[in-house]
Every structure is written in C-alpha cells, then in structure tokens.
C-alpha cells in the first residue's frame, strides 16, 4: 500500500509535487552550436531559443507524459534519459532513468549532455528545474491545467523541435475528438459519480481535481463537489448517503476484484462500476481521448 501511495502522490497530475506558487525559473542559455530551425517561447520567460536539427537533438524527459509527447512527435530516438514510470510506448522502458519521485539525478543528466530537457511545471521539483537551467541547460517547462492545454503544449514543443507539422496534426485531432465528446454530453444536468483509486483509505476527488475535469467532459461531476480539498478521504456511509450515478474506479485491478468491495452494499447502492486505466487518466497524454470515450460511455 505504501508503494501505491508513493506512485499516486508523486506521478499523478491529480496531485503535484510542487505548490501552485512554486514556479521554476526557466530562463535558459542559447543552445550551443545549434542550427536555427525553429523557436518557441519557454514558460515563465520571454527568452526564445533555437533548436538544432531534430535528428541530432538529445532530449531528456522528466515526466512520463512528456516522454509520450516526444514519441508522438517522432522524437523517441532522440530521448537519452527519462523519468521513472515512462512506460509508454514500449520502447520508453529501455531508456536510461534520470528522475524519480525524489527528484532529478542532476549528475546523470549533465553527463548525458542533453540539448533539451522536458520538465513538468507542477510535477518536477522547482529547485531541480532551477538548478538545471542555472547550469546553462535548456529547459522546456510545460504546465497543463486544463485538458485543452495538452494540445497547445504539444504544439509549443513541436515548434521548438522542428516537428511543427506533426504537432499541429496531433493537436487538431485531439481537440476535434475532445470537442465531439463535449458536444455529445453538453447541456444536461451533471451526473454525480464516485471517482476513486483505492479503498484503504477510501479517497475520492474534489471539484478542482484533474479527475473532475475529465468527468465534466462526460456531463458528470464528483460526488463531493462541496469538498474543500482536492482529494478527500470519505467513508462508505458518505457514498451511500449521496447515491452516485456511477462508481468510477481508476485501477489496474479486475472488475471481480473491485466489485468485492461494493458487494455487501448492493442492497443500498445500484450504481454501475466503471473501470478506467489510471496510467492514462492520470497523465496529460494524447491517449486520454480514447479513455475518455470509455469513461463517458460508462457514465451515460
């Protein structure tokens, strides 16, 4: 259980390692010996940097979703270092690990001599990002607060790495599918659902949590919209009293394993149990669209 909690609290965007006010200093130095193919603005700074030929670019990713973005843009071969839990696509599993929930391995990163470091503003430690950028390394700091930010951030990364055409295509496809889903479920009263990841302790999501933003696409909302915190601990009684329209388990466990917990309460609760993949719903990934379709279908 301790291991599961560590993974959840350190790598799901539902909870961040850095506070909202902890904005890293992302000012960077120009890339050495680079060819000026493309430029992009880095977060929290007005500094523009030029990227070298993409074929020669050495990239390090400090978050699993950033690793996925790089592969989506055809930059998988350029990755020389990634964070723990960078497990998609399969090829990502074979790349050297240079960061985990404790932080970035600065020495290992420097030794790899990267041209570009992809950092997660809100997930990576601000002091690590500041340290790397202060050493003259180029840091692309990405911040995602809403689902549509995934598309805009991928376009920003594409502009920086001379993969604009691919990034624009991916971004447009993502937004088209997202808007189709939103339009399908828009305009109806929000259905209350109980979204959880485990049962010991039984925890759910508040109104401002990432999971609730996913639910809103499906015309639903957390069963606890009045929660003052993003990830409240609740009791079975709380759930039964509020009578959710559906139970959403973000879990790798089977339906049979998850249903055992609710079985003794079925005389008072007839909400269907829907399972979503936490590796997808918790990441700012392009794969999120297909998982959202399954989520919405289960709730309707």
Regions found by a protein language model. Give the residues of each.
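Basic- and aromatic-lined ligand-binding clefts that recognize polyanionic substrates
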Residues: 52, 57-70, 165-218
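Positively charged n-region of N-terminal signal peptides that target proteins for export
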Residues: 1-5
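A short, structured surface patch at a secondary-structure boundary
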Residues: 57-112, 116-123, 128, 223
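Bacterial N-terminal signal peptides
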Residues: 6-15
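Flexible loop/hinge segments that line or gate small-molecule binding clefts
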Residues: 126-156
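His/Asp/Glu-enriched short active-site or ligand-binding loop at hydrolase and phosphoryl-transfer sites
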Residues: 83, 208-231, 274-275
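Short helices/loops that flank or line small-molecule/ion binding pockets
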Residues: 106-113, 135, 234-243
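Structured C-terminal subdomain patch of bacterial secreted/periplasmic proteins
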Residues: 104, 148-159, 168, 172, ...
